[in-house]
């Protein structure tokens, strides 16, 4: 088993890699690791006039299912609830259109450069 601190570090690196990728695609960061009593929003971005709630999922290997499959119905519900709370608390974004994206990253950590670790950006991965 991989120690928790190593897993957390790999997760932070994957999030930083995803953020850099999205910014290169023209999205702007609103919030990162926004916490509430119902969960966490990894990245809240702005794509044009759309608020994008991005769930970043990293899996070293897909022995128990891949990164995309880990965003199941239960996780989607938690993300929707957290997004609703975000829009209530940060009300300046409440009237903007919203969507939920998933960034799925699989492979060995430490080489998040896009050539050896594939990144899969799923726009509008699910509906609220």
From Swiss-Prot:
One of its GO terms (molecular function) is nucleic acid binding. CDD domains: PoNe_Nuclease. InterPro entries: Restrct_endonuc-II-like (IPR011335), tRNA_endonuc-like_dom_sf (IPR011856), UPF0102_YraN-like (IPR003509). HAMAP family: UPF0102 (MF_00048). Belongs to the UPF0102 family. This is UPF0102 protein PSPTO_4420. It comes from Pseudomonas syringae pv. tomato (strain ATCC BAA-871 / DC3000).
């Amino acid at each position: 088993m991989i120690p928790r601190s190593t897993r957390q570090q790999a997760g932070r690196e994957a999030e930083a890699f995803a953020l850099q990728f999205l910014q290169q695609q023209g999205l702007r960061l609103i919030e990162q690791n926004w916490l509430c009593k119902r969960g966490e929003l990894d990245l809240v971005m702005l794509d044009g006039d759309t608020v994008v709630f991005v769930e970043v999922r990293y899996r070293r290997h897909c022995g128990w299912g891949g990164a995309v499959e880990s965003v199941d119905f239960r996780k989607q519900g938690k993300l929707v609830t957290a997004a609703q709370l975000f829009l209530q608390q940060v009300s300046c974004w409440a009237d903007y259109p919203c969507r939920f994206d998933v960034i799925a990253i699989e492979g060995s950590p430490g080489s998040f450069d896009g050539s050896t670790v594939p990144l899969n950006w799923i726009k509008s991965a699910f509906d609220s």
